[in-house]
Swiss-Prot record:
It holds the Pfam family RTC. This is Probable RNA 3'-terminal phosphate cyclase-like protein. Part of the small subunit (SSU) processome, first precursor of the small eukaryotic ribosomal subunit. During the assembly of the SSU processome in the nucleolus, many ribosome biogenesis factors, an RNA chaperone and ribosomal proteins associate with the nascent pre-rRNA and work in concert to generate RNA folding, modifications, rearrangements and cleavage as well as targeted degradation of pre-ribosomal RNA by the RNA exosome. Does not have cyclase activity. The lineage of its organism: Eukaryota, Metazoa, Ecdysozoa, Arthropoda, Hexapoda. One of its GO terms (biological process) is ribosomal small subunit biogenesis. SUPFAM superfamilies: EPT/RTPC-like. The keyword Nucleus applies. It is found in: Nucleus, Nucleolus. Keywords: Nucleus, Ribosome biogenesis. GO terms for molecular function: RNA endonuclease activity. It comes from Drosophila melanogaster. Part of the small subunit (SSU) processome, composed of more than 70 proteins and the RNA chaperone small nucleolar RNA (snoRNA) U3. Belongs to the RNA 3'-terminal cyclase family. Type 2 subfamily. NCBIfam families: 18S_RNA_Rcl1p (TIGR03400). GO terms for cellular component: nucleolus; small-subunit processome.
Amino acid sequence: MPPIAQEGNCLIYRGSNFLKQRLILACLSGKPVKISQIRSEDETAPGLREYEISLIRLLDKITNGTKIELNPAGTSVMFSPGLLHGGQLNHDCCVQRGIGYYLDALIALGPFCKSPLQCTLRGVTNSKDSPSVDHIKGAALSLLKRFLLVDEGLELKVVRRGVAPLGGGEIIFRCPVRKSLRAIQFQSQGMVKRIRGTVYACKVSPAMANRTVEAAKGCMLKFLPDVYIYTDQNKGKMSGNSPGFGICLIAETTDGVCFAADCCSNTREESEDTPSIPENLGKEVALRLLDEIYRGGCVDSSYQWLAALYIALGQKHVSKFLTGALSNYTVHFLQHLRDFFSITFKLENPEAEDEDEAENVRGAQKVLMACVGIGYTNINKRVI
């Protein structure tokens, strides 16, 4: 959705959709953004939700000089970004969303901060409405490594887990800074060579984790033999504040592409109506991973937008990146990139040149994203 108006350098949007995209791009471009009529028609709970306010507070912590104006009802916000500072910080995330909701913003902004980012986030590590920390560790960080080239200082560590609804988890995210991101041409996804996974169980019987592992491995061993799933059984303070269990599977290809899928059990309130069965959970996550592999491309479908961001901000050379069918979220992100950076992409369906290549890209129709980077330079980074 294009901005409804533009006052000087300030972009004006309407509605609550894609708030995180707009705030991230505002921080990177330095352009102020005003968003009005945020759930103004919702009579019971108009305005920004608590998790959205928590995200704005996090962006305020990693920047220096940011100005935020909220109207009393919370239905309008004016966000004037400052310089990305980074450094060491702690943040208690709202438990209405998983930590993955906030980590997405840190991964996008981290390489362009003044100081290397070392962030401790507390909240829900595994939830249904946000990518889990295991998903991000497997899919998003592997993508970021391709653009950083040297991944020294890049780390995502799970200190303790916490599932919905009460959370209680904690993670530490470290990200190095770069002067600029390199242009990249990545058009080969390779063949899946191994599958790794993590099953966690918090305040429930260890048998739940073992049954989930058996069901997931039963599906995946039909396709390849190299399947290993690690069991993470937590007790006491290390298991957060709520009971639950879940699983994350990561498929790695011969070219280093990672596809991920995760699934978690229902909360205690939801389990009263529909209890979670470990065998069904294991089978569901296996099918989700197979669907992700079928989509294909050189990036997990959840992080197509991140690949688009990095190649758009790269050096002034042609970058090409192969993805699966574009998600709705990625399509809107490309539109927002045009609004903030005036950059457009060339999107085309690649055609195989020979039969061998056609077999390698078997699966869903692929999309080749191509653009000339804007040559974004990290002005915040110290130059010695």
